[in-house]
Amino acid sequence: MEKFQSYLGLDRSQQHHFLYPLIFQEYIYVLAHDHGLTRSILLENAGYDNKSSLLIVKRLINRMYQQNHLILSVNNSKQTPFLGHNKNFYSQVMSEVSSIIMEIPLSLRLISYLERKGVVKSDNLRSIHSIFSFLEDNFSHLNYVLDILIPYPAHLEILVQALRYWIKDASSLHLLRFFLHECHNWDSLITSNSKKASSSFSKRNHRLFFFLYTSHLCEYESGFLFLRNQSSHLRSTSSGALIERIYFYGKIDHLAEVFARAFQANLWLFKDPFMHYVRYQGKSILGSKGTFLLMNKWKYYFVNFWKSYFYLWSQPGRIYINQLSNHSLDFLGYRSSVRLKPSMVRSQMLENAFIIENAIKKFETIVPIMPLIGSLAKSKFCNALGHPIGKAIWADFSDSDIIDRFGRIYRNLSHYHSGSSKKKSLYRVKYILRLSCARTLARKHKSTVRAFLKRFGSELLEEFFTEEEQVFSLTFPRVSSISRRLSRRRIWYLDIICINDLANHE
C-alpha cells in the first residue's frame, strides 16, 4: 500500500476522499496488474497477449470518456451494450480496479491506526491457522456453544450504506451501485447458502464482492466485539487481531461511543465472564460457561441485533444452542469435542490400598476421516470406500512429475491438518496417495504395482511423502527428542493463506 500511496500522491489529508478520477488513470490498472490483482482478467481474454494488455486499458478508458455509453447503458441496457461488445470483460476489469481504489482510504486508516496504537502488523495474521488459536482455549470448562449462520444482506444498498462512513466520494458510491445492479452473479450469491457462497468467492475470485462482504462482516463484528468486551470480566487483548485479518481497525473506536449509548441499559442481561468467539467463512461459534437461559438470550439478541441495525431478517433457527459435552465443533476440516478421559489413582493408607477412578475432561481436536476420503474420492484418488485407484488422466506425465504431484498434495494436506491431536487420519491419507501414485505409475509403464515397486523400489515414493517428524528433525537437527515430541502434538503453521481444495471438504 505504500507503493500505491507514492504513486497516487496521497497523504493523511482528505485528498483520498476523491477517488472517482482515479478510475481514468492508466497507472492504476498497471499497478493492479503488477500486484497480480487483475492479472487473470487482463491476460485470459482470447486474442490478447501480455504486451497488448495496456492496449486494453487504453481502449477501456477511451470508452469511459464517451459518456453516452454509460448513460445509454443505464437507461436502455437491453439495446445498447455496456462499453461495447465485451460488456462482461470490461465490467469485470472496472469492478476489480474499483475495489482496489476503494480500499485506499481503508488501508490508510489501517496504517494510521497501527501507528497510533503501536501495533506491529504481522503478515502471519493472514494465515488460516491463526483462526485455530481458538482451539487452544480451555474449552473443557465450558457448557454451551452457539453455532451461528451469519445472514447475508437482503438488499444491495445495505452494503453501500456501510461504506459511506469510510468513502466520502459520492461518485464512487454511485459507480459501485451501478456495478452491483449490473452483475448477474450477485443474486445467486446472496440467496445461496454459506457453502455455495464461499465456493463462489474462491472460484470466481471477485475481489469487489469479497471486499463488500468483508466490510459487512466488519460492521457486525465491531458491534459484537464491543459488547463482548463490555460483558466479559476478562478483557480481550487479542480481539483486534480478528479485525486485522480483514484490515479494518478504526471501526472499533468509532462504534464504541455509539454502542455505549445504545446498549448501556441492556448489558446487564449478558454478563458472562467466560466467552470464546471465532468466525470462519459465513459462520461463527460462540462458547460460554453460562446457562441455557443465558445462551437463549444471546440467541435472540443476535436476531434483534441484525434486524435493528443491519436490516437483516434472520430466523432463530439459524442459531443453534448445543451442549458441549455431547456436541462436536466442526469447522474448516477439523472436529473438536470434550471427552472424558478415565484415570486411576492408587492410594495407600497404612495397610489398606485403595484404587480411585476419576474422569478428567479433555478437549480433543481430530480430523474426521470420512469427509477427507470423500474429497479424495471426488478427485479420483480412491473410491467411496477408501480403496486407492490410479489417476488415469496423469498417466501421460513424466514419472517425476507424477510423483511430485502426489507428494505435494500429501504435504499440503499434512501441513494443513497438523493441528490434529491424533495422526491416524493422516496415515490413512498417506496410504491412499502412495498406492494411488504407484498404480498411476504402473498404468503408465503397463505393469502391475508389485512389479513396478520391485523394479524401482519403494524408496522411490518414500522421499516425496515427508513425515512431520522428519521436517522437525531438519529444523532441530541437534535435538531429536524435541522434534519427535513436537511431531506428535498439535502444530499450527502461520504460512497457510488459502485452503486446499482437498482440505476444504465441508
From Swiss-Prot:
GO terms for cellular component: chloroplast. One of its GO terms (molecular function) is RNA binding. It comes from the Eukaryota. The keyword RNA-binding applies. Its main location: plastid. The keyword Ion transport does not apply. GO terms for biological process: mRNA processing; RNA splicing; tRNA processing. Keywords: Chloroplast, mRNA processing, Plastid, RNA-binding, tRNA processing. Coiled coil: none annotated. Pfam families: Intron_maturas2, MatK_N. It is found in: Plastid, Chloroplast. Signal peptide: none annotated. Usually encoded in the trnK tRNA gene intron. Probably assists in splicing its own and other chloroplast group II introns. HAMAP family: MatK. Belongs to the intron maturase 2 family. MatK subfamily. This is Maturase K. It comes from Lactuca sativa.
